[in-house]
Curated annotation (Swiss-Prot):
Modified residues (N6-carboxylysine): 217
A GO term for molecular function: urease activity
Residues involved in substrate binding: 219
Organism (species): Cupriavidus pinatubonensis (strain JMP 134 / LMG 1197) (Cupriavidus necator (strain JMP 134))
Domain Urease, chain residue ranges per copy: 129-571
Phylogenetic placement of the source organism: Bacteria, Pseudomonadati, Pseudomonadota, Betaproteobacteria, Burkholderiales
Protein name (record): Urease subunit alpha
Active site per database record: 320
Reaction(s) this enzyme catalyzes, per UniProt: urea + 2 H2O + H(+) = hydrogencarbonate + 2 NH4(+)
Top-level EC class as recorded in UniProt: hydrolase
Length: 571
């Protein structure tokens, strides 16, 4: 039997079972749990390699083969960290296993044929496309920025640079819903829109759901009173749509207890649950312990650093149309920015009490930094708090597989479950839409190499188009063919409500993208949040703002230096 060293094998085919990989320049290390390929039967494309006619490529018709195979990829997902070939067909994930030619190779579960394209995954990490559930659609250029960061699904609301959209993620009314659904046809991104949920009568809310909204947004700037909360959730229950809420910072219509009471145990997604982005001051953070609350953070407070507090005050004044000359507006802003609750937010993420991370794009958050900020938070917590239970600390330094699974779930499967789109996206699983992101380990979470939408490359880091090879400078992110023409419409989804799909909004509005209805939003609960389902009893001292969870005081120092930062963005 011919043997090969681990180093040589990894250099040729990528890491295998037991090998460890560092993520970017963080302190996070993952270990390959399983290898679905077969030693000695690996497939690889190129001159003198395996995927050639009569060798690793079969003679079978396209109907029996995958359209694309990603070879020898290292999959990082909530369900595992494994090495495998990935087969894509018809825009979806067809198989995860062993690719090749079953006529001459054993154990083949992914058939390669003359109709198969190859993407080399050796030495690459593959993740599911990110899902950002807190989007202010202030400008369409956000969409490209998000896509190039590895986000493939955006959920939120807005109409452009209108004052209401600067502050709230709302696409209000049927007319705007139709226009925005038509506008997003131009972009290679899965998108779902939220309507305005602030009303005390059901009819004006219901008509927005029927017009295409996948959910509703309650925002204090429109008046998030207990009556509005109750009415909005009643419509959501009737239509199987989700509600996202930004609660009452000033406690005008009641304190956090009144808001929890208005929920009446019904499922709701709480935005920026720590409170710096808005919500009952100073103790909105305590809702993360409720069984019906699905809590998320926005990325400006991720993670807590020495700069976090200073930048927040200026951002807040702009985003919520506040006047620095008015004392009450200054007091409003200062009530939201609390170092103690921001520090506690880091720890609550690490312990799995906060389930999701999103951006709050151009409205205090950065649309292209959801993934970066998530992994910076994971790194900071690993450095300050050590290994999580379940992650070993052996003579080789151990690995962080469980922590990595916990954090990747925050921007993939958990937002998908929350908003009723997990049947389509949110993980690398057979049958799901093939929205995949390929990363070099050194650039993981920062700069993806390829972004696939619906099984086709939509964006990539590409060199000079006039060069003799693809790699010469300047290399920057450019849209690829899945972002063009009719392929764009076939490669991306528009999410709508079941009521809108039944009302045939696609034909009525002249939409070309594939429409997919959200479902299961009213039965999801905190216990369904993958790796992030802890429900602590949280209290906040009204004078010191100190946060205690299940009797434990939550405190940590701000970071003075972070990975995944300046060294990646010099050019």
């Amino acid at each position: 039997m011919v043997k090969i060293s681990r180093q040589a094998y990894a250099e040729m085919f990528g890491p295998t079972t037991g090998d460890r990989v560092r993520l970017a320049d963080t302190g996070l290390v993952i270990e390959v749990e399983k290898d679905f390929t077969i030693y000695g039967e690996e497939v690889k494309f190129g001159g003198g390699k395996v995927i050639r006619d009569g060798m690793g490529q079969s003679q079978r018709m396209a109907k029996d083969c995958v359209d694309t195979v990603i070879t020898n990829a290292l999959i990082v997902d909530h369900w595992g960290i494994v090495k495998a070939d990935i087969g894509l067909k018809g825009g979806r994930i067809a198989a995860i296993g062993k690719a090749g030619n079953p006529d001459i190779q054993p154990g083949v579960t992914i058939v390669v044929g003359p109709g198969t394209e190859v993407i080399a995954g050796e030495g690459m990490i593959v993740t599911a496309g990110g899902i950002d559930t807190h989007i202010h659609f202030i400008c369409p250029q956000q969409i490209e920025e998000a896509l190039m960061s590895g986000v493939t699904t955006m959920i939120g609301g807005g109409t452009g640079p209108a004052t209401g959209t600067f502050a709230t993620t709302v696409t209000p009314g049927p007319w705007y819903m139709e226009r925005m659904l038509q506008a997003i046809e131009a972009y290679p991104m899965n998108i779902g829109l939220l309507g305005k949920g602030n009303a005390s009568q059901q009819a004006p809310i219901l008509e927005q759901v029927e017009a295409g909204a996948i959910g509703l947004k309650l925002h204090e700037d429109w008046g998030t009173t207990p009556a509005a909360i109750d009415t909005c959730l009643s419509v959501a229950d009737a239509t199987d749509t989700q509600v996202a809420i930004h609660t009452d910072t000033l406690n005008e219509a009641g304190f956090v207890e009144a808001t929890i009471a208005a929920f009446k145990g019904r499922t709701i997604h709480t935005y920026h649950t720590e409170g710096a982005g808005g919500g009952h001051a100073p103790d909105i953070i305590k809702v993360c312990g409720e069984a019906n609350v699905l809590p998320s953070s926005t990325n400006p407070t991720r993670p807590y650093t020495v700069n976090t507090l200073d930048e927040h005050l200026d951002m807040l004044m702009v985003c919520h149309h506040l006047d620095p000359a008015i004392a009450e507006d200054i007091a409003f802003a200062e009530s939201r920015i609390r170092r103690e609750t921001i520090a506690a937010e880091d720890i609550l993420h690490d312990l799995g009490a906060f389930s999701m991370i999103s951006s709050d794009s151009q409205a205090m958050g950065r649309v292209g930094e959801v993934i970066i900020r998530t992994w910076q938070t994971a790194h900071k917590m690993a450095a300050q708090r050590g290994k999580l239970p379940g992650d070993p600390n052996d003579a080789r330094g151990g690995h962080d597989n469980f922590r990595v699974k916990r954090y990747i779930a925050k921007y993939t499967i958990n937002p998908a479950l929350t908003h009723g789109i997990a049947h389509e996206v949110g993980s690398i699983e057979v049958g799901k839409w093939a929205d995949l992101v390929l990363w070099r380990p050194a650039c993981f979470g920062v700069k993806p190499s390829l972004i696939l939408k619906g099984g086709m490359i939509a964006a990539a880091a590409m060199g000079d188009p006039n060069a003799s090879i693809p790699t010469p400078q300047p290399v920057h992110y450019r849209p690829m063919f899945a972002s063009a023409g009719g392929a764009l419409h076939k490669s991306s989804l528009t999410f709508v409500s079941q009521a809108a799909l039944a009302a045939n909004v696609g034909e009525r509005y002249g939409l070309a993208k594939t429409l997919s209805a959200v479902r299961g939003t009213r039965t999801v609960s905190k216990r369904d949040m993958v790796h992030n389902d802890w429900q602590p009893h949280v209290t906040v001292d009204p004078e010191t703002y100190q946060v205690v969870a299940d009797g434990q005081l939550l405190m940590c120092d701000p970071a003075t230096e972070l990975p995944m930062a300046q060294r990646y963005f010099l050019f």
